[in-house]
């Protein structure tokens, strides 16, 4: 930029115009610079704030996956890596911890709830609750399932920020009636008999009727 300021200015204007064209003027004005690592390398593209909820329950698409990458960890819960894509939630240990998704239910009805999970066998048995507005569904994390990480799938060394994956199994929590509207879908623990609750890859909501 110092060597060719005119070229740099022209490119900056082109990027600004592209943001307005793609995101609209209001959102483009809020775009922020990418975060940098301690080594000064850029990590990701420009960050554009977006408070749109994740849609749930269209009759044409009754199954809605809510992966960890779209959720928000609270308390001691952490992502399995700094890169959200293909990550899962770990370090869920107490009743003060929780995981949330900002969703908007399109169709009032009965939804089946299935969680893709792993849990050390000695820690199985935590009582958990999924809630959305006034609706609540409780269940138990069982049986235990603690597979090893898949460490033999990379031909090249995996970048530090990417998760090593493992085989998650479905935990059928049951069914719950969700009413149309926007709200916070919350997953929390009511009792934790062991050292941890579970690791969570995804919550699946399927509109049944």
Spans of features found by a protein language model:
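C-terminal, low-complexity/hydrophilic appendages and adjacent surface loops
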Residues: 1-2, 9
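Extracytoplasmic
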Residues: 8-209
């Amino acid at each position: 930029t110092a060597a060719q300021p005119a070229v740099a200015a022209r490119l900056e204007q082109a990027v600004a115009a592209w943001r307005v064209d793609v995101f609209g003027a209001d959102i483009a004005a809020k775009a922020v610079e990418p975060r940098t690592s301690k080594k000064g390398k850029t990590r990701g593209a420009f960050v554009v704030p977006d408070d749109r909820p994740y849609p749930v329950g269209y009759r044409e698409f009754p199954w809605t996956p809510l992966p960890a990458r779209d959720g928000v960890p609270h308390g001691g819960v952490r992502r399995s890596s700094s890169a959200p894509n293909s990550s899962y939630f770990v370090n869920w240990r107490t009743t003060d911890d929780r995981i949330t998704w900002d969703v908007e239910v399109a169709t009032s009805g009965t939804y089946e709830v299935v969680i893709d999970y792993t849990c050390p066998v000695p820690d199985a048995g935590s009582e958990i609750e999924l809630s959305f507005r006034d609706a609540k569904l409780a269940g138990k994390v069982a049986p235990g399932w603690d597979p090893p990480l898949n460490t033999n799938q990379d031909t090249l060394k995996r970048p530090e920020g990417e998760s090593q994956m493992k085989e998650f199994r479905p935990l059928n929590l049951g069914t719950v009636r969700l009413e149309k509207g926007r709200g916070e879908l919350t997953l929390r623990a009511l009792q934790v008999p062991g050292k941890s609750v579970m690791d969570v890859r995804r919550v699946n909501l399927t509109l049944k009727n």
